[in-house]
Amino acid sequence: KYKDIGFGKVVFEGVSLWTKSALLDVFTRYLLLKKHRKAIRNRDLAVRKMVSLYGEKGVMMADSFIAMDEESIKHISHDCAFVDLPNLTPEEQKSCVFFYGSKEFDLIAAKKVLPQKYPQAKFHIWQGYGHCRKITENPRAYSMILRNEIFSSNC
């Protein structure tokens, strides 16, 4: 579809692979809007929850979430439920790396979609981790993992 865009290596962390999932859209929209309204009412609680999940970056993440407008949240929910997966050649697939935490919801779709749609892509599960928790636990170690992936031989 976008063959004018080229890449050497692409690393996806916890990316949604849900397609045409109206029920997921309704559920996530409801849940995110409810959490957003609660965060607006009680910033301190939102910050505590985010810090408990993501460490010191949680303050910035909570403030960013609070600052979002509801229309943006609805768009995020929709985009996560209706992903338009491109067709990739086997060579393009070999340049893709998909990372998921074993405790994250998007792993359900990844386990179904990746072997069928992108069988040549690398697929790794971080055992014991939730969504994007591997990144925030130790950013320096994670950056080394990314560096190793980017400079690996199948690029």
Regions found by a protein language model. Give the residues of each.
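Flexible "cap/lid" loop of the alpha/beta hydrolase fold
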Residues: 4-37
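Short, conserved loop/helix-junction motifs that constitute active-site signature segments
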Residues: 2, 88-93, 116-118
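Conserved beta-strand scaffold positions in the cores of enzyme catalytic domains, especially
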Residues: 10, 98, 123-125
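Short beta-strand/loop motif that positions the catalytic acidic residue
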Residues: 91-92, 98-100
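Conserved alpha/beta-hydrolase catalytic His-Asp/Glu region
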Residues: 38-90
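Conserved alpha/beta-hydrolase "acid-adjacent" motif
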Residues: 104-111
